[in-house]
């Protein structure tokens, strides 16, 4: 979907997970304003605290901003959600999340 579709979704329903996650992820994919991506992805994680991909996207956005100490607990929470069985998937992202945590130091 085009980024404008996600912006419309957020404007119409600011507390909607899909709009917030989609917009934050799309901003990341486009290499745009990572601060804005963090804003939307934080809301997405608050709305669905066991959505593994949202944790991964937020962790990547924080890391891109050099905010490594903020990124690590976000990534660890995503790993915990995936490995505890509380999430509906996302286990395939665990190796990438662990690798990013190691890279962050």
Whereabouts are the PLM-identified features?
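TPR/TPR-like (Sel1-like) alpha-helical repeat modules
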Residues: 63, 68-87
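Structural marker of alpha-solenoid helical repeat scaffolds
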Residues: 12, 46-47, 81, 85
